[in-house]
């Protein structure tokens, strides 16, 4: 059953990523891959909150927990797109933009995962 829940939640995560990313690009533009940055940062915050705030010890069945963490969060965040977009920036000669993309995705995502854990501990 794990696979069924992971697939269902994964599909929802992918659709959510598509919608959030598109909204961010429409709002801010495409000077940098802001849509990918947004989903990675939001996903890091949510996973920190969820893991520290109750999914580990919640009375949720293991299938649902796997669906949320591996499925939804895995479908929502995207390391492969971040990597691809960074390579494209490098190929285009946009070294500063590529460096900024790496720095922002890694640093801000890690900070927001920590923030999620911190916030969950305050609840």
Curated annotation (Swiss-Prot):
Function, as annotated: Fluoride-specific ion channel. Important for reducing fluoride concentration in the cell, thus reducing its toxicity.
Membrane-spanning parts: 4-24, 31-51, 64-83, 100-120
Highest classification ranks of the organism: Bacteria, Pseudomonadati, Thermodesulfobacteriota, Desulfuromonadia, Desulfuromonadales
Pfam annotation, one family: CRCB
PANTHER family, sorted: FLUORIDE EXPORT PROTEIN 1-RELATED (PTHR28259:SF1)
Organism (species): Syntrophotalea carbinolica (strain DSM 2380 / NBRC 103641 / GraBd1) (Pelobacter carbinolicus)
GO molecular function terms noted in the UniProt entry: fluoride channel activity; metal ion binding
Record bears the keyword tRNA-binding: no
Name of this protein: Fluoride-specific ion channel FluC
GO process annotations (BP): cellular detoxification of fluoride
Main localisation: membrane
Notes on activation and inhibition: Na(+) is not transported, but it plays an essential structural role and its presence is essential for fluoride channel function.
GO cellular component: plasma membrane
């Amino acid at each position: 059953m794990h696979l069924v829940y992971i697939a269902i939640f994964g599909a929802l995560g992918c659709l959510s990523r598509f919608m959030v990313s598109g909204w961010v690009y429409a709002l801010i533009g495409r000077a940098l891959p802001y849509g990918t940055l947004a989903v990675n940062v939001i996903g890091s915050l949510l996973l920190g909150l969820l893991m520290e705030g109750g999914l580990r010890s919640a009375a949720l069945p293991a299938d649902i927990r796997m669906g949320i963490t591996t499925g939804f969060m895995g479908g929502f965040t995207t390391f492969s797109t971040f990597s691809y977009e960074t390579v494209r920036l490098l190929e285009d000669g946009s070294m500063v933009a590529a460096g900024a993309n790496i720095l922002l995705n890694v640093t801000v995502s890690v900070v927001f995962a920590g923030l999620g854990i911190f916030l969950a501990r305050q609840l």
